[in-house]
């Protein structure tokens, strides 16, 4: 008797909605990590942001090409940062022209006023690496081009680690994230792989169990590695989303948070400096945490609405 072939579905699924949900998870990890609620949550959130950036950039470049590449990066990443950088200059008062310049441009060099914003120059390093490699191998067939881009980005990890010794300030932990952006690009390249439903479920279940086991090592007194922990937290979030449909109130909340993930990231460092004072001044730490979350969220929503309105007016 003939049996129908087993249905094969994409091994990895990450549409715009799921990406937004993961952005929501990433920024929540950052906020909870920076306030000491989730151990190494900040590292896990940054790793997840970088993986999503690599994934999204490669998908975008494959569909749109490299035309307008830098304009898109400036409009979506650097320009929103610049206006907040101006605010940082006035509020944080960095000393010296070099510190002001680093703050406005997003460079680190140990001089940037808001130390959490080392991420801006870090992500632009990867944008540059991707652009150069894609240009070099742009004339090759699509499949070979993908392989060369992947190999080139893995080689770019070397200068990334070297630059971490001085280009980004010591506390950034930039060495911990050297594989995250290339990993996101690799996931984008592999997104068309299809597998039987049972095999797909088994793959992601094994991935989730492996991540959970590693994250539990500190409970057993085993010292973990920062870069592995960051990527493991990000991997666990991705695996959960592949296995469990997120719906209802949780989905709506994460989508909402994900929509404002970038402005939240831009402002949380600014309010984090105030948070330390609030912890001392308020009767309980949870009150300071709540004030920090509320202030960051209010500033992010207001700023993003103003920026979007300005962007729409300039595009008209």
Which positions does each model-derived feature cover?
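Histidine-centered divalent metal-coordination motifs
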Residues: 34, 265-268
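Membrane-cytosol interface segments of multi-pass membrane proteins
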Residues: 1-157, 248, 260-261, 280-316
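Alpha-helical transmembrane segments and terminal signal-anchor/GPI-anchor hydrophobic tails
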Residues: 156-263, 270-292
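Transmembrane helices and adjacent periplasmic/lumenal helix-loop junctions
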Residues: 124, 267-270
